[in-house]
């Protein structure tokens, strides 16, 4: 009781006992009420510890308040008690419980008003864009503030990582807040590589723009002076409006928010794209029985973001569906939390819940409580538990020093001094907190308590110096320890001033020396001669014992040697007394909290065997790391393990330790990549002084989150399992762990932040452990700043070794070579080889790609062609003549060194593009002619058929994105193309909304469109109706044309396809026509290729068509669907399809469309019933808005017996639908039933058994299916009933999926029926007879009949086979006249029989076989029986 009564103490307890239970009553609150309240909280799964603070009481009140209306008297009493306790904690004066409740209500009303006011302020503030505001300049005019490179980078990163998942929409909405149409088009341009998605977006924008123009017609008459014109749809999309016009509309009075309107259109298009990529309904998101609640919530909100609904509806979905669709374990907890629970509270409450593991933990917890109670009752008292022992030797709990397995520490276990044991120690206080002293030359560094806490990698407790009070007995009892530790760095020799015998001397602190050796000093005391060995040989010294030495205010007494030493040395015999340690600095910054993924545990992978030399190498490496504090030993209580191994360093005999963290990486939480890419020197501004630094042992300088360290455990085995393996865990960021880069970058950024704020004139580029520091200061001043930076980093535990400290140019940084006024890539040497392997060529291409960013003209296309196909890395690849020529050209380019210059923000960016031929392009970005910032190349072909203008557009897009990332703005382009050619192409290209600023530059070869297709039919020109057909089996085909002037032609083709024949027909028409021609085709494939106006292709046939198109003056190409009603096409179709294809005209299209509008048949059913090609049937389904809500369900035949049915109840519109599915065929019987009772289920089962052969029904464990009525019906109809596994939807998988499919079909036909029961039967009919697919391409109705008929035939056949097997056969082989047998008779046919003689199976003609009945053993072998008992 004492523990629970400690909720209040001192004066608060007195106040508590003065409060009356009721107004005017005699009874007052006592300690027993607190004890009762804490026990009640246990009952309601709330933490009793919350009662100890006002904040905790407030949390309890929030949880209990929703249950007051419907709760029991105990809940109300508990609420009143906690409310009174809250007032006592807050020192609110009250006389009784009623006053406490009034005070609580007053506080809650006040908080609610404040929250509403804050929400109102937030709404008011949200009206103004905070992201890209249109700000006013000094003249009061509105000016535009463009998107930042960081915003565009974030947008590109989201698309790359999320790939149009639902998260993309809120991210786009957030990033584009307040953006103008021009900003929005820039965002779309940066992801223009996603052509299919962008085409869908373009269509949506065009539709919305057309709708805008329809709703907002243009006013007749001229615009009044000073009045702004009204925006059209194309103006809102940024196509026909300028930036100034957009600003004018957005800031006018009244404003027209063209940016928000355009943004809304884009979001509509993004929603369509998201639905295509993520066709999952929110109703289908249910938590699996063993699925962690966090994963379920992630899936739920991902689907919710893709839903087309208002925010109110989405809020309702979150409040109801999230709980409703959780698994039973989580649902129980969520309902107990109440309706007002936040998502964070739900996730905390449900953490680790679900599955057998959760049930095992609950059971174990209950059992442990029972066990503990029994033990305490057996003891008969409530004394404290047995005190945990602690080892004097290793400091760990659980054992004493006598049983310690660790190596025995030198000196006394009590005080740490050498020369005596613990039993002889005179110290009064044991010093478990060993000293952690180090020395600094000038002044001690003050560390904050937080920094001190993180300073030790192995223990998070602060370490106290000898003589200071222990944390528990500090001056103020708070456990703080003085942390004025002297410290000295190792940038130079660690020399300190010492006092010995009243004399001052300078000495070197040497952790490698055993003894203290000094020279030129006289000590007035006894000594004895001694010989010691050193680096220079042996020297004679005088040994003085018990000599006092004072170093940095610390005193020590020990042995001192005096002799001719080159330098005074303080050895370990003195350093250990002073508590001096050699500290490898580990950053004192706060650790970043890290967790495993929800529901996952750490890796438990066994260590694989290692060779002796690897074990020795790992043992040595780990011993050094342990001494440095990077790792520490763990015992058997840590159950986790990750394999470790060793490899030899490149070109070295030294070993390197590697830990295989792949499994831990899978289980560790995800991290956001802090840095989106590496910095580029072309983006650096020219600086007067530059320094490049490298952080040494980067990862090993940052501490790992303490609670996560146990998961990094690894084991070093012993040879032949001689001893148990030595187990370690990491205290710092491990190499190879997925979180190390992100945490290091984050830590480094925090550390550099104060230095950057203090020194804004210093530019620091940080990428992992590489630092580029630039300034316009004079060199001496700059170096002082560098020294200050290095000291700042060292304070936080980051060393910057002299070895990698670059003070003078050229600076080697990130693979680049930096000079004061120029930069280049580090020298590249191309190898000279006779034989090239795949790996050699890969490395060569990598080097050339790296060089191409500053060396213009580099080409790699022919070299890359050598790598096509699946080849091993060691395969020898002969260089083609083209590849040799390309390599020779590249070598010539690399002979002369080329340099780039630095960026000047005051000058304009210019990008110039040149065509190199063979689909290769090169470009330079510069600010002054012949002084390139950087260069690059482009050699991608995104499609098989392309043209130069399209490729140039792709180059422009790549350069624009690259420039935005490096400089934050797009350059002005100089392109080798005439403006008319460019604008002709871009008019039809989707990105017409964003055209960069550019000018024509006459750099041969120029880009041009070699031909142009007409938009309207050419009057007077001959019209060619073309068609082609191919037989899939024979690969033969025909192509031909018919003209409006009576000409016709057909050619036969071999080894062809339908697509090739369609293209060949167009080629024939072009070849045989005049300079002007109209061509009509029915091939969307051919039309798509030619309308893109390619001037090169991978297809020889398309190249021939291009050659013919270039010769023409005018060409008009048109498409007609299915040739219907077009005479010319009807004629040519008959010509080319004769003997090639059976169905030519698709007369069934209208009937199929009518059928689909009524029944919403799937494409297979329509293709089968109306003889339609699959592409046409699919197009009918695709054009139906009701069939595009979700992807079409795939139906397959399950391997189950013909008599098995699955039954389940589903709910729709508040009514119950009982569904039965024939498992083998997918056939459905369903009807709406009045109530979910056993009687209704039994009646339905009897009806089902009267229609179909039902042998087994499989149901869930619902009360209706486990009722006596259902059991009786099953007994009467001789049906076996089986039950599913509780909470496992997979056990009812067939009927569960059919429930979804049935609801989907009901949704498609619901508006055709007044009542739900009618719609259900219509949906059953459609599913059973209007949807085809699966094995055999049958509908479900056809399939069940086929299965039952086949089953009957099989059974009858089996009876015949059984009957036949009662006969034996005597037979003759070919010319052998002797009868053989008897043999078994597996099968009897009309002209032959199948016999089995021993293990051999033969087919024998009936005329050579005699079949007799098997009468038993006595008749076997009797020759005459063969004649008498002949069955024939």
Curated annotation (Swiss-Prot):
UniProt xrefs under InterPro entries: Aspartic_peptidase_AS, DNA/RNA_pol_sf, Gag_p24_C, Integrase-like_N, Integrase_C_dom_sf_retrovir, Integrase_C_retrovir, Integrase_cat-core, Integrase_Zn-bd_dom_N
UniProt short sequence motif Nuclear export signal, positions renumbered to this chain: 16-22
Gene that this polypeptide is encoded by: gag-pol
Activity regulation details: Protease: The viral protease is inhibited by many synthetic protease inhibitors (PIs), such as amprenavir, atazanavir, indinavir, loprinavir, nelfinavir, ritonavir and saquinavir. Use of protease inhibitors in tritherapy regimens permit more ambitious therapeutic strategies. Reverse transcriptase/ribonuclease H: RT can be inhibited either by nucleoside RT inhibitors (NRTIs) or by non nucleoside RT inhibitors (NNRTIs).
Motif Nuclear localization signal per record, residues: 26-32
Classification via Gene3D superfamilies: 1.10.10.200, 1.10.1200.30, 3.30.70.270, Acid Proteases, HIV Type 1 Reverse Transcriptase, subunit A, domain 1, Human Immunodeficiency Virus Type 1 Capsid Protein, Immunodeficiency lentiviruses, gag gene matrix protein p17, Integrase, C-terminal domain superfamily, retroviral
Region (Interaction with host CALM1): 8-43
Modification type Phosphotyrosine: residues: 132
UniProt keyword annotation of Transcription regulation present: no
Site (Essential for RT p66/p51 heterodimerization): 985, 998
Domain Reverse transcriptase: 628-818
Region Interaction with Gp41, residue ranges: 7-31
Region of interest (Dimerization/Multimerization of capsid protein p24), ranges: 277-363
Entry protein name: Gag-Pol polyprotein
Cofactor info, note text: Binds 2 magnesium ions for reverse transcriptase polymerase activity. Binds 2 magnesium ions for ribonuclease H (RNase H) activity. Substrate-binding is a precondition for magnesium binding.
Chain positions recorded as Zn(2+) binding sites: 1156, 1160, 1184, 1187
Catalytic activity: Specific for a P1 residue that is hydrophobic, and P1' variable, but often Pro; Endohydrolysis of RNA in RNA/DNA hybrids. Three different cleavage modes: 1. sequence-specific internal cleavage of RNA. Human immunodeficiency virus type 1 and Moloney murine leukemia virus enzymes prefer to cleave the RNA strand one nucleotide away from the RNA-DNA junction. 2. RNA 5'-end directed cleavage 13-19 nucleotides from the RNA end. 3. DNA 3'-end directed cleavage 15-20 nucleotides away from the primer terminus; 3'-end directed exonucleolytic cleavage of viral RNA-DNA hybrid; DNA(n) + a 2'-deoxyribonucleoside 5'-triphosphate = DNA(n+1) + diphosphate
Region described as Dimerization of protease: 486-490, 534-540, 573-585
Residue stretches making up the Peptidase A2 domain: 505-574
Residue span of region Interaction with human PPIA/CYPA and NUP153: 189-227
GO biological process terms held by the UniProt record: DNA integration; DNA recombination; establishment of integrated proviral latency; proteolysis; symbiont entry into host cell; symbiont-mediated activation of host apoptosis; symbiont-mediated suppression of host gene expression; viral genome integration into host DNA
Any one GO molecular function term: structural molecule activity
Annotated segments matching region RT 'primer grip': 811-819
Motif (Tryptophan repeat motif): 982-998
Annotated residues for binding of Mg(2+) 1: 694, 769-770
Pfam families (alphabetical): Gag_p17, Gag_p24_C, IN_DBD_C, Integrase_Zn, RNase_H, rve, RVP, RVT_1
Origin organism lineage: Viruses, Riboviria, Pararnavirae, Artverviricota, Revtraviricetes
Biased composition (Polar residues): 449-459
């Amino acid at each position: 009781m004492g523990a629970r009564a400690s909720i209040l103490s001192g004066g608060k307890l007195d106040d508590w006992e003065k409060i009356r239970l009721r107004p005017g009553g005699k009874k007052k609150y006592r300690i027993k009420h607190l004890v009762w309240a804490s026990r009640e909280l246990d009952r309601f799964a709330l933490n009793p510890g919350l009662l100890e603070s006002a904040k905790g009481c407030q949390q309890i009140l929030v949880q209990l308040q929703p249950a007051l209306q419907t709760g029991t008297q105990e809940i109300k009493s508990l609420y009143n008690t906690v409310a009174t306790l809250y007032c006592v904690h807050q020192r609110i004066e009250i006389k009784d419980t009623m006053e406490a409740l009034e005070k609580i209500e007053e506080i809650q009303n006040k908080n609610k008003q404040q929250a509403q006011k804050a929400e109102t302020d937030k709404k008011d503030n949200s009206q103004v864009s905070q992201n890209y505001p249109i700000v006013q300049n000094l003249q009061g005019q509105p000016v535009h503030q463009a998107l930042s490179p960081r915003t565009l980078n974030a947008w590109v990163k989201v698309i790359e990582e999320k790939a149009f998942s639902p998260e993309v929409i809120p991210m786009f909405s957030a990033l584009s807040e307040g953006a103008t149409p021009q900003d929005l088009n820039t965002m779309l341009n940066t992801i223009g590589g996603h052509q299919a998605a962008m085409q869908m977006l373009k269509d949506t924008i065009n539709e919305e723009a057309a709708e805008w123009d329809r709703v907002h017609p243009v006013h007749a008459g001229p615009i009044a002076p000073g009045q702004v014109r009204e925006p059209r749809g194309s103006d809102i999309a940024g196509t026909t409006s300028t930036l100034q016009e957009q600003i004018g509309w957005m800031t006018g009075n009244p404003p027209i928010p063209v940016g928000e309107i355009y943004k809304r259109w884009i979001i509509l298009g993004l929603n369509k794209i998201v639905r295509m990529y993520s066709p999952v309904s929110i109703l289908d998101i249910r938590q699996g029985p063993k699925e962690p609640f966090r994963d379920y919530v992630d899936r739920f909100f991902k689907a919710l973001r893709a839903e087309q609904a208002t925010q109110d509806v989405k809020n309702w979905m979150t409040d109801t569906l999230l709980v409703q669709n959780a698994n039973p374990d989580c649902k129980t907890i969520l309902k107990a939390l109440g309706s007002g629970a936040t998502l964070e509270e739900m996730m905390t409450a449900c953490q680790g819940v679900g599955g057998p593991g959760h049930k095992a933990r609950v059971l174990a917890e209950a059992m442990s409580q029972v066990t503990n109670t029994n033990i305490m009752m057996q003891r008969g008292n409530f004394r404290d538990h047995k005190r945990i022992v602690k080892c004097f030797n290793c400091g760990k709990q659980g054992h004493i020093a006598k049983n310690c397995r660790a190596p025995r520490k030198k000196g006394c276990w009590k005080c740490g001094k050498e020369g005596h044991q613990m039993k002889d120690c005179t110290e009064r206080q044991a010093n478990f907190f060993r000293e952690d002293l180090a020395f600094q030359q000038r002044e001690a560094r003050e560390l904050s308590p937080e920094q001190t806490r993180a300073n030790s990698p192995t223990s998070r407790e602060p370490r106290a110096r000898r003589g200071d009070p222990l944390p528990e007995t500090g001056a103020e009892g708070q456990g703080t320890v003085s942390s004025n530790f002297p410290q000295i760095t190792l940038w130079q020799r660690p020399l300190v001033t010492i006092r010995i015998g009243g004399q001052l001397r300078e000495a070197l602190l040497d952790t490698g020396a055993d003894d203290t050796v000094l020279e030129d000093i006289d000590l007035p005391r006894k000594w004895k001669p001694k010989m010691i060995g050193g680096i220079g040989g042996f020297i004679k010294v005088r040994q003085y014992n018990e000599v006092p030495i004072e170093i940095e205010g610390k005193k020590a007494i020990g042995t001192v040697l005096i002799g001719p030493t080159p330098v005074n040395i303080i050895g370990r015999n003195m350093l250990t007394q002073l508590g001096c340690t050699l500290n490898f600095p580990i950053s004192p910054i706060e650790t970043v909290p890290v967790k495993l993924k929800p529901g996952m545990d750490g890796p438990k992978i066994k260590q694989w065997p290692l060779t002796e030399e690897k074990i020795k190498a790992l043992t040595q490496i780990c011993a050094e790391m342990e001494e440095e504090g990077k790792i520490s030993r763990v015992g058997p209580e840590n159950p986790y393990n990750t394999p470790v191994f060793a490899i030899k360093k490149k070109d070295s005999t030294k070993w390197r330790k590697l830990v295989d963290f792949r499994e831990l990486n899978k289980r560790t939480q995800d991290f956001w990549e802090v840095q989106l890419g590496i910095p580029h020197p072309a983006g650096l501004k020219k600086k007067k002084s530059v320094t490049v630094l490298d952080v040494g042992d980067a990862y090993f300088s940052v501490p790992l989150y303490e609670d996560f360290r146990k998961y990094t455990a690894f084991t070093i085995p012993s040879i032949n399992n001689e001893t148990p393996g030595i187990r370690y865990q990491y205290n710092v960021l491990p190499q190879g762990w997925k979180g190390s880069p992100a945490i290091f970058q984050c830590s480094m950024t925090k550390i550099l932040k104060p230095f950057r704020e203090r020194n804004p004139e210093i530019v620091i580029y940080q990428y992992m452990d590489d630092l580029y520091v630039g300034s316009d200061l004079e060199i001496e001043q700059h170096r002082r700043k560098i020294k200050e930076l290095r000291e700042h980093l060292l304070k936080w535990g980051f060393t910057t070794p002299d070895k990698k400290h670059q003070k003078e140019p050229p600076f080697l940084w990130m693979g680049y070579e930096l000079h004061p006024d120029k930069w280049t890539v580090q020298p590249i040497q191309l190898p000279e080889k006779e034989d090239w392997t795949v790996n050699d060529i890969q490395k060569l291409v990598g080097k050339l790609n790296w060089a191409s960013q500053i060396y213009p003209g580099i080409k790699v296309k022919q070299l890359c062609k050598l790598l096509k196909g699946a080849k091993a890395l060691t395969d020898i690849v002969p260089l083609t003549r083209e590849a040799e020529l390309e390599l020779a050209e590249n070598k010539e380019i690399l002979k002369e060194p080329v340099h780039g210059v630095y960026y000047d923000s005051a000058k304009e960016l210019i990008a110039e593009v040149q065509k190199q031929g063979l689909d290769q392009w090169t470009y330079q970005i510069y600010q002054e002619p012949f002084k390139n910032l950087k260069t690059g190349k482009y050699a991608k072909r995104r499609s098989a058929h392309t043209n130069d203008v399209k490729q140039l557009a792709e180059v422009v897009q790549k350069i624009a994105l690259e420039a935005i990332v490096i400089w934050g703005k797009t350059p002005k382009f100089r392109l080798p193309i005439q403006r008319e050619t460019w604008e002709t192409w871009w008019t039809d290209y989707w990105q017409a909304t964003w055209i960069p600023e550019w000018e024509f530059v006459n750099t041969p070869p120029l880009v041009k469109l070699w031909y142009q297709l007409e938009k309207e039919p050419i009057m007077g020109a001959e019209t060619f109706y073309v068609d082609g057909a191919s037989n899939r089996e024979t690969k033969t085909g025909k192509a031909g044309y018919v003209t409006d002037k009576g000409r016709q032609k057909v050619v036969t083709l071999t080894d062809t396809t339908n697509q090739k024949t369609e293209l060949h027909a167009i080629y024939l028409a072009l070849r045989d026509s005049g300079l002007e021609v109209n061509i009509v085709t029915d091939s969307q494939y051919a039309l798509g290729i030619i309308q893109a106006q390619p001037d090169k292709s991978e297809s020889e046939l398309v190249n021939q068509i291009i050659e013919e198109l270039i010769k023409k003056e005018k060409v008009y190409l048109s498409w007609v669907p299915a040739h219907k009603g077009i005479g010319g096409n009807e004629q040519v179709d008959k010509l080319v399809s004769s003997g090639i294809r059976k169905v030519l005209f698709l007369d069934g299209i209208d009937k199929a469309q009518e059928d689909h509008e009524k029944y919403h048949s799937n494409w297979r059913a329509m293709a089968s019933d109306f003889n339609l090609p699959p592409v046409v049937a699919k197009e009918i389904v695709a054009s139906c808005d009701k069939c595009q809500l979700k992807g079409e369900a795939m139906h397959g035949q399950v391997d189950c017996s013909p008599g098995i049915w699955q039954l389940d109840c589903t709910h729709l519109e508040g009514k119950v639908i009982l569904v039965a599915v024939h498992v083998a065929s997918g056939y459905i019987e369903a009807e709406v039933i009045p109530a979910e009772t056993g009687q209704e289920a039994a009646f339905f089962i009897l009806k089902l058994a009267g229609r179909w052969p039902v042998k087994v029904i499989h149901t869930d464990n619902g009360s209706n299916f486990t009722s006596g009525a259902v059991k009786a019906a099953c007994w009467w109809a001789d049906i076996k009933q089986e039950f599913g596994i509780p909470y496992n939807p997979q056990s009812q998988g067939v009927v569960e999926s059919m429930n979804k499919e049935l609801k989907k079909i009901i949704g498609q036909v619901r508006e055709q029926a007044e009542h739900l029961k009618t719609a259900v039967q219509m949906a059953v009919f459609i599913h059973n007879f209007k949807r085809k697919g699966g094995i055999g391409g049958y509908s479900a109705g056809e399939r069940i009949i086929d299965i039952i008929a086949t089953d009957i035939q099989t059974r009858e056949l089996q009876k015949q086979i059984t009957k036949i097997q009662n006969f034996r056969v005597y037979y003759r082989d070919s010319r052998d006249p002797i009868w053989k047998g008897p043999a078994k008779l597996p099968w009897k046919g009309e002209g032959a029989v199948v016999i089995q003689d021993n293990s051999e199976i033969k087919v024998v003609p009936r005329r050579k076989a005699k079949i007799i009945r098997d009468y038993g053993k006595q008749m076997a072998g009797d020759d005459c029986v063969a004649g008498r008992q002949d069955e024939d």
